[in-house]
């Protein structure tokens, strides 16, 4: 059975220009978050998530 396409979706809705300034992965916020080291609890959770993928 094929799923029906949603009526409310608009073409280009997920485009970067529709999500505001610095919304993508190259934003300054994303670059700052990536530099912080993980604490022990976050590291353990990360291992579990990678294992489940």
From Swiss-Prot:
Residues 1-53 are annotated as: Disordered. GO terms for biological process: asexual sporulation; sporulation resulting in formation of a cellular spore. It is found in: Spore core. Keywords: Sporulation. It comes from the Bacteria. The keyword RNA-binding does not apply. Induction: Expressed only in the forespore compartment of sporulating cells. GO terms for cellular component: endospore-forming forespore. Its main location: other. Belongs to the SspO family. This is Small, acid-soluble spore protein O. The gene is sspO.
């Amino acid at each position: 059975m094929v799923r029906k396409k949603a009526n409310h979706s608009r073409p280009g809705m997920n485009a970067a220009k529709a999500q505001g300034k610095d919304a993508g992965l190259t934003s300054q916020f994303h670059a700052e978050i990536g530099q912080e080291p993980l604490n022990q609890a976050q590291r353990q959770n990360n291992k579990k998530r990678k294992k489940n993928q």
